[in-house]
């Protein structure tokens, strides 16, 4: 039930959506019992993007929701243009809601003469006029420090672990991290699933080849257990496919894959469908068309989490409280 203050102030909250994932925006609007503000958005013949809102935005608390699937640059630019239009239309506060933060894997320099593109994205959002960012499961936590303003880093863990607990009760599980760097997150998953043990994949990455990972060996006991293999995203599926093969070779009885972001670039669907996983669970932070779906895929809605976050920000409540101090 929405509070009395929420009802009185609802006219000040406005939700805007880019064209990348309108279904998610409509789900969020439904959770908030409001509508997505209408707009004209189109490309000129040369590909330049134009945006104009149909109603006054003066003094509003604006939330601009845009996911960034392929083509990433198009949708990022559209969100920047929307934010600029809101700033020039005298919106009181502008929050960029970016469920999947673009360029998050370029968060540091691996070698000389490389960009830090995740920082550049943060600078672009600030320059366009964003006062705040809401995002979900960043590739690395340090990206929060790239933006000069509040960053609400939400977690999909509760949604994913809740689904697993409900659908796999009394299962002999082990949580598997795809690499040693995500063991701390795997520990939180283990606690959320009732104190199950952990394992991780030792792997190496060829920095010269995108999306190329070599999985070497499993560290931990997985024989006879159902492995819950976790990651922040599944892109081409190369990392998880190699990990599934290793886990099977080490005697795992079943493998469930859980990730927040289903990028699912080709040939991910084919790989994941043929590697003998029991279920692949992702959220809808990104649109997942029919061409990316396969029988083992389950897509959970992140809309309730985003709506709760928007509500908390609008009412000046605690976003951290949504995660019992873990946000």
UniProtKB/Swiss-Prot annotation:
Catalytic activity: D-ribose 5-phosphate + ATP = 5-phospho-alpha-D-ribose 1-diphosphate + AMP + H(+)
A Pfam family the protein falls into: Pribosyl_synth
Main location: cytoplasm
Residues that, per the record, bind Mg(2+) 1: 139
Annotated residues for binding of Mg(2+) 2: 179
Uppermost EC category: transferase
GO biological process: 5-phosphoribose 1-diphosphate biosynthetic process; purine nucleotide biosynthetic process; ribonucleoside monophosphate biosynthetic process
Binding residue positions for ATP: 46-48, 105-106
Coiled-coil stretches: none
Name the UniProt record assigns to this protein: Ribose-phosphate pyrophosphokinase
Lineage of source species: Bacteria, Bacillati, Actinomycetota, Actinomycetes, Mycobacteriales
